[in-house]
């Protein structure tokens, strides 16, 4: 699955070695001569970084080497990924950053999920006949753009835990955007596949110079993005949420049919949340609460599967995949019916994880038979309250988004697990002219047809699947897991945990083990490596796995060995990611 190329990167040395008046800068050592020479697995005594792009990993690792903590490194990495993976995340989007504070032992989530503008309406994704506008159309319109939260989230994280300033941490990414870097295979493929979307906006001048898509090995220069980063460096987040940039951003959204105003940007705020917790085979799991559906349904699936002693079956047996698929169908049915922004709707968290409800769902799973009509259950029987919404059938035409996940741990015990996104590849494709910021299409994560828990409302956050997760043993963090991939995120995190803990696989093997995803009887995916005879058996039972495998997710993970004092980082081979361990010289 690993995509490689052999373009010399030594010219980047001048980009990443930052000089100037600021006393501390994140820097990167002279990179190897090709991206594929970076390690997907590394070990460190003093910290670890694992991201989906080697240059972002270098920048984060350099923060740790120079005395910054995991939160400082995470902020620097997010800016770097905005440059190196512009199709996946950035300051035009949002995300969920989970932080374990090594000093206080508290685990906290910075929720920078985008919000709908004040002008958003429940029916804004319906046509004049009251029918849902096709996903392919609504995904590129201004109505799809949510008020971005990433920058506010980074600011809050630094205020709470940081030891370096945003001014310092953004500088290497300014240099990277100004001077450029060689495009890798993942970005090149994205530009080629989405050139029609990019050609409609200011993005064409960046990614399609002279009308032709940039290719692998070409240098990507983003001078307008560098200019925006410089504004943020000098004026802070107000440079984004107020003033000339805010006006240009909101005007651009309106030009593409949206309603966002400067006031929407000025009024945006993040939330600081506690994780939702669960137990699994002696581990305590901290994961994301609503408005992400990721955590609650990760825990629900783990609880359902724990009953079946999954590892009695071979890891690539039809029995294992049958139990996974049936469990996914039930949990994703619940997700579609009961999950939404808790500031607006009642989410039955206790009911969904209640032991009696879990038993009820387990009884619907038969090893030898496919449940042809998996439906949502009634978790409200197991807790007080009731739904303030209906169950509304939605169109089946949504394309799962991308995103990026990265993770950092430092020598002081701080741990970050961070999933961040602009939703689809290149979001809406809309770029803020003269500023180089690509805008998300996050509002298409709302239901197109109103009435359900996830209908569009002003200031509401659309339902997410992002699942940054930290596992604890004896109250100490021992494993971070997360992935991109839209609704597939939950299944990728689930399977990584199952393979590492239930099956006892070494971490890299657990990350690389072929994954499946199915949220209903009409939607199936599987990765290369699932045996053909197993697929035939499953399809003979009534499943509908297709003929072509696809990559599912892109897991980055860190395991922490407290006894030996080591960190092990793993980057998934489905992108050109890198794990970099920190080993400081001892005097």
Curated annotation (Swiss-Prot):
Catalytic machinery residues: 403 (nucleophile)
InterPro entries per the UniProt record, alphabetical: GGT_bact, GGT_CS, GGT_lsub_C, GGT_peptidase, GGT_ssub, Ntn_hydrolases_N
PROSITE patterns (alphabetical): G_GLU_TRANSPEPTIDASE
Domain of life: Bacteria
A single Gene Ontology CC term: extracellular region
Alphabetically ordered keywords of this record: Acyltransferase, Glutathione biosynthesis, Hydrolase, Protease, Secreted, Signal, Transferase, Zymogen
Disruption phenotype: Loss of ability to grow with glutathione as a sulfur source.
Catalytic activity of the protein: an N-terminal (5-L-glutamyl)-[peptide] + an alpha-amino acid = 5-L-glutamyl amino acid + an N-terminal L-alpha-aminoacyl-[peptide]; glutathione + H2O = L-cysteinylglycine + L-glutamate; an S-substituted glutathione + H2O = an S-substituted L-cysteinylglycine + L-glutamate
Signal sequence range: 1-28
GO molecular function: glutathione hydrolase activity; leukotriene C4 gamma-glutamyl transferase activity
One example of a Gene Ontology biological process annotation: proteolysis
PTM comment text: Cleaved by autocatalysis into a large and a small subunit.
Subcellular location: Secreted
Keyword ATP-binding: no
Pathway participation: Sulfur metabolism; glutathione metabolism
Propeptide segment residues: 29-35
Family: Belongs to the gamma-glutamyltransferase family.
Cited function: Cleaves the gamma-glutamyl bond of extracellular glutathione (gamma-Glu-Cys-Gly), glutathione conjugates, and other gamma-glutamyl compounds. The metabolism of glutathione releases free glutamate and the dipeptide cysteinyl-glycine, which is hydrolyzed to cysteine and glycine by dipeptidases.
Protein name, as recorded: Glutathione hydrolase proenzyme
Species assigned in the record: Bacillus subtilis (strain 168)
The organism's taxonomic lineage, starting at the top: Bacteria, Bacillati, Bacillota, Bacilli, Bacillales
């Amino acid at each position: 699955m690993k995509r490689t190329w052999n373009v010399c990167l030594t010219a980047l040395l001048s980009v990443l070695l930052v000089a100037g008046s600021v006393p501390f800068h994140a820097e990167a050592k002279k990179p190897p001569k090709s991206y594929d020479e970076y390690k997907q697995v590394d070990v460190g005594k003093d910290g670890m970084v694992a991201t989906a792009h080697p240059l972002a990993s270098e920048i984060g690792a350099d923060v740790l080497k120079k005395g910054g903590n995991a939160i400082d490194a995470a902020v620097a990495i997010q800016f770097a990924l905005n440059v190196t993976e512009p199709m996946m995340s950035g300051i035009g989007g949002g995300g969920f950053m989970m932080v374990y504070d090594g000093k206080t032992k508290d685990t906290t989530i910075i929720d920078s999920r985008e919000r709908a503008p004040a002008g958003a309406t429940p029916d804004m994704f319906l046509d004049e006949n009251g029918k849902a506008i096709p996903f392919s159309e609504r995904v590129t319109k201004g109505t799809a753009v949510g008020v971005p939260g990433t920058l506010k989230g980074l600011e809050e994280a630094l205020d709470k835990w940081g030891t370096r300033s945003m001014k310092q941490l953004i500088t290497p990414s300014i240099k990277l955007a100004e001077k450029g870097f060689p495009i890798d295979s993942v970005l090149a493929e994205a530009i080629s596949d989405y050139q029609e979307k990019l050609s409609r906006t200011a993005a064409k001048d960046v990614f399609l110079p002279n009308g032709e898509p940039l290719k692998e090995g070409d240098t990507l220069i983003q001078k307008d993005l560098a200019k925006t980063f410089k504004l943020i460096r000098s004026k802070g987040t107000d440079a984004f949420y107020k003033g000339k940039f805010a006006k240009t951003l909101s005007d651009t959204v309106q030009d593409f049919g949206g309603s966002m105003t400067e006031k929407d940007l000025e009024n945006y705020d993040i939330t600081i949340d506690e994780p939702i917790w669960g137990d699994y085979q002696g581990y305590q799991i901290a994961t994301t609460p609503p408005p992400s559906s990721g955590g609650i349904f990760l825990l629900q699936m783990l609880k359902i599967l724990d009953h079946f002693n999954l590892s009695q079956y071979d890891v690539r047996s039809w029995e294992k995949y049958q139990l996974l698929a049936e469990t996914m169908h039930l949990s994703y049915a619940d997700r579609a019916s009961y999950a939404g922004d808790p500031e607006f709707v009642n989410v039955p968290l206790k009911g969904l994880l209640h032991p009696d409800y879990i038993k009820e769902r387990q009884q619907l799973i038969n090893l030898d038979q496919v449940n042809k009509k998996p439906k949502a259950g009634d978790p409200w029987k197991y807790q007080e309250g009731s739904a303030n919404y209906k169950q509304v059938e939605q169109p089946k035409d949504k394309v799962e988004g991308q995103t990026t996940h990265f993770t950092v741990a430092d020598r002081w015990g701080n741990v970050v697990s961070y999933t961040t996104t602009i939703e689809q590849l290149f979001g809406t494709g809309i770029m803020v002219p003269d500023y180089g910021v690509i805008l998300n299409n996050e509002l298409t994560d709302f239901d197109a047809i109103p009435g359900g828990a996830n209908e569009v409302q002003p200031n509401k956050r659309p339902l997410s699947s992002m699942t940054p997760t930290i596992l604890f043993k004896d109250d100490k963090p021992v494993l971070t897991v997360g992935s991109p991939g839209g609704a597939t995120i939950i299944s990728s995190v689930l399977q990584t945990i199952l393979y590492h803990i239930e099956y006892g696989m070494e971490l890299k093997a657990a990350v690389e083990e072929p994954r499946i995803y199915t949220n209903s009887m009409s939607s199936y995916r599987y990765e290369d490596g699932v045996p053909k005879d197993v697929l035939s058996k499953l399809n003979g039972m009534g499943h509908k796995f297709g003929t072509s495998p696809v990559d599912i997710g892109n897991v980055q993970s860190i395991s922490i060995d407290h006894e030996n004092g080591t960190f092990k980082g793993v980057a998934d081979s489905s992108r050109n990611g890198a794990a970099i361990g920190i080993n400081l010289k001892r005097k």
